[in-house]
Amino acid sequence: MFPNVEQYQAALQQNLSSIIVDKSYHSASIEMSALGIPRIRSGNFALVYKLKLSNHDKALRVFYRTNFDIANRYEEIIKIINLLNKQQGNQNYFVETSYQVSGIRVDGNLYPIIIMDWSPGLSMGDFVSINYKNATLISNLQEALKNAFYVFEKNNIAHGDIQPGNVLVSKDGKNITFVDYDGMFCPSIKRFGASEIGHKNFQHPDRTERYFNEK
């Protein structure tokens, strides 16, 4: 069983050197809310915190509920996204990601974490809301999405939860980055089955857990 939200919140108000195992993050600080407590961005299975370092920021993902084999699943997902980033050169569709099986100490016990680069950019939802009257920018976004999906199809992978909050867009609309890989599909994890079916407002209404493939 994983810690709950309150346990993570209490732990992350301590000095990070006492709870984060990886020493390279001991000098980091957690982004705080206006109330002076760690700011949370939550997902289906994980809480996301912003780690602020001197020269760059990272996303810290901690799990608070799950019903799938995290370690084996993410080990395979990270392999494929890092490989695709190398192949794509300047257009990385995924952020650099690492999985640490014993990454955080909460109430004396060690739990897994995921560390990801903090990717700049507007969410696709915000980008469209701001620029919907700008045909050039919307066309740039359309082309970027088309190119990304071509790469996905060629490599037999699927993000699994394409929705406005999971796609970050550059100011000119030409570069996009996908985040939140909990529902991702690649052939090497087909045996695990689907961990989620994505945001219901952006998926086919007949989609169920038994549909777990590159489509």
Predicted feature residues:
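Catalytic-loop of the protein kinase fold
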Residues: 153-170
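Conserved structural core of kinase catalytic domains
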Residues: 93-140, 191
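Conserved end of the kinase activation segment
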Residues: 206-215
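Short C-lobe core helix of eukaryotic-like protein kinase catalytic domains
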Residues: 144-153
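Conserved activation segment of eukaryotic-like protein kinases, specifically the C-terminal portion
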Residues: 192-207
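Juxta-kinase regulatory segment immediately upstream of eukaryotic protein kinase catalytic domains
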Residues: 1-39, 72-80
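ATP-binding glycine-rich loop module of kinase domains
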Residues: 36-38, 44-95, 107
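Activation of the activation-loop gatekeeper triad in protein kinase-fold domains
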Residues: 179-185
